Amino acid sequence: MLEKLIERVLFATRWLLAPLCIAMSLVLVVLGYVFMKELWHMLSHLNTISETDLVLSALGLVDLLFMAGLVLMVLLASYESFVSKLDKVDASEITWLKHTDFNALKLKVSLSIVAISAIFLLKRYMSLEDVLSSIPKDTPLSHNPIFWQVVIHLVFVCSALLAAVTNNIAFSQNKAH
């Protein structure tokens, strides 16, 4: 009797994630607002914007879109996996979610982080002259911010590769059984 009560209480705690999922949907609203603000800024300066600034603005919008997609993916998968099935939604609308297990979600998140990091580095590359001109010539490599941004990006890439290899090994072992 006590065991069943404890199990029911523990299982019911999954609903504590529901408010967090709702709060994450507010993050989407904020990202949408920032996206529209950046788009408006870009469009309102269309006649005077340089090609470099246009590319940087476009990369910023792509970055925000990736981030919004990442938030949505984690939000829906978390709700579906831990809180409740999304059975009120047309199943054809979320077919990807039905085939997304925790390992696949980790891989998608890792790849999204790599893409976001790559876009950030590309934006830095577009303004490389400004960044390098602000660094004294005798500065050691370890004090160069671009060096560390590339190192962090490579860590993200290696993490995503390791996650993919681990997922592939685990999937092939499960398939063999």
From Swiss-Prot:
Chief place where the protein resides: membrane
Keywords tagged on the record: Cell membrane, Membrane, Transmembrane, Transmembrane helix
Localization annotation: Cell membrane
Membrane topology: Multi-pass membrane protein
Alphabetized Pfam families for the sequence: UPF0114 (PF03350)
TM regions (residue ranges): 15-35, 54-74, 145-165
An annotated GO cellular component: plasma membrane
Top-rank lineage group of the source organism: Bacteria
Family membership: Belongs to the UPF0114 family.
UniProt cross-references to PANTHER family, sorted A to Z: UPF0114 PROTEIN YQHA
Family annotation (NCBIfam families): HI0507
Protein name: UPF0114 protein HP_0189
Organism this protein belongs to: Helicobacter pylori (strain ATCC 700392 / 26695) (Campylobacter pylori)
